[in-house]
Structures are given as C-alpha cells and as structure tokens.
UniProtKB/Swiss-Prot annotation:
Protein name: Probable septum site-determining protein MinC
Region ranges (Disordered): 99-124
GO biological process entries: cell morphogenesis; division septum assembly; regulation of cell division; regulation of cell septum assembly
Record family assignment: Belongs to the MinC family.
Species assigned in the record: Klebsiella pneumoniae subsp. pneumoniae (strain ATCC 700721 / MGH 78578)
UniProt entry tagged with the keyword Cell division: yes
Keywords in alphabetical order: Cell cycle, Cell division, Septation
UniProt-listed InterPro entries: CAP/MinC_C, MinC, MinC_C_sf, MinC_N, Septum_form_inhib_MinC_C
C-alpha cells in the first residue's frame, strides 16, 4: 500500500468528439438524438468533448449545454473555442477548455535548417496481440498501430491511434485513428464487426455492405464518410 493518500499518473482515454456546425440548440439536440439512436450501446451516456471551432457567431453556451445534456451525453470538455466571451461563459459553467494536441504555439522560423532526427526515433512501435481477444476485453494501442493475429470476439474492443490489422475473424468493435488521425485505416481478413470507426466516423454492422461481410476488407476515411474495398 502506498504511503501517500493520492497519486497522480499520466494516462490516455478515448473520447468521442462532437463537432458542432450549427449553433441552434434544438437542431443540436435532435441531431445528437438521431446519432445516439443509431448506436445506443456505444453512445448512450457517453463522455464526449464538444468542438466548437466552426461556431463563429455569438451564442448562449447555457442553451447549448442544456441541449447536449438532455440527450444523456456527458461533456468532459470543450475545444476549439475562439470567442473570448464564450470562453468565459464555458469556464464559469465549470467545463474544462481543452487545447487539441495538434495545435502548436507559433514560433519564429529557425535561422538554419534543423537536422533530421536519428533514424531510430522515427520508428513507430506496433502493438502485437497473438492471443484471441475475448468478449469484454478492451485493447488500446496509443500512438501506434495495433495488429491482432487471432480472432476478436463480439463484445471485444480494439482501439488504436494508428491503423488496426486483424488477421482472424473480427466480430467486435474496431476504432482506428482514435487520436484524430484521418489517414488511419482498418484491415481485416474476415470482417464481421459490430462497429468500425476511423477518427470518429463510424459504421455499425448494418452499415457494412453485404458483399464485404465476412470477407477480407480494407476501410479508410473518405472526404466525409467511411469507404471500403476488398483486401487483396
């Protein structure tokens, strides 16, 4: 047992991000309820981050907050806020204002070219799972790809910030690009997933085209939706 009453440790959690493109609270509520109805087991009472980068007009945060809360979603934070008054309103509501990892503070250009890092530092590790992934298990591969060389049961969940490869029957949920990488892909030799997701865009099993169900397939993210093709 630790001698200290508390301990702070770094960790990573996968959260869905709700990108708002309309400031009307009723429109937001209805759109969210429609999404939740498509995947209630995945989204009902889910913790989410709300991105309001597309909202440039003056809005009342309280009304938007109440509309989202009415759907059962739980707001863990708000990102992309560019309006000072709105930032103050969100902060007073006790909701954290988040800065997305891809945002970087501007800095002057270096006077000389920066030498490339050593080759070893450019290598991205891959998490490899050889055992079957059983129902109820959740496997997360932060900042790398995930490869499973066995079957994935229904009720199991694979999450990776990079690509996901499954060399076996894929019956569970696969969430690639969990950190927002829209170039991530999913590769399966036998696709029968409950849910597939890339950077927050997802399909339920009913959305998977029948001609690909149970077959070898490759999924990627198009301009605004998932796309699928045979895995050769």
């Amino acid at each position: 047992m630790s001698n200290t009453p508390i301990e702070l440790k770094g960790s990573s959690f996968t959260l869905s991000v709700v990108h708002l493109h309309d400031a009307n609270p009723e429109v937001i509520r209805q759109a969210l309820e429609d999404k939740i109805a498509q995947a209630p087991a995945f989204l009902r009472h889910a913790p989410v981050v709300v991105n309001i980068a597309s909202i440039e007009e003056e809005v009342e945060w309280r009304a938007i907050n109440e509309a989202i809360a009415a759907t059962g979603l739980r707001i863990m934070g708000v990102s992309g806020c560019k309006i000072p008054r709105l930032k103050t309103e969100i902060d007073r509501a006790g909701i954290p204002l988040l800065t997305e990892g891809k945002e970087k503070a501007s800095r002057p250009a270096p006077s000389e070219p920066t030498p490339p890092p050593p080759v070893a530092s450019q290598i991205t590790k891959t998490r490899l799972i050889d055992q079957p992934v059983r129902s109820g298990q959740r496997i997360y591969a932060p900042h790398c790809d995930l490869i499973v060389t066995n079957h994935v049961s229904a009720g199991a969940e694979l999450i990776a910030d990079g690509n996901i490869h499954v060399y076996g029957m894929m019956r569970g949920r696969a969430l690639a690009g969990a950190g927002g990488d829209r170039d991530a892909q999913i590769f399966c030799t036998h696709l029968a997933a409950e849910l597939v997701s890339i950077a927050g865009e997802y399909w339920l099993s009913d959305n998977i085209p029948a001609e690909f169900y149970g077959k070898a397939a490759r999924l990627r993210l198009g301009e605004s939706a998932l796309a699928i093709q045979p895995l050769n």
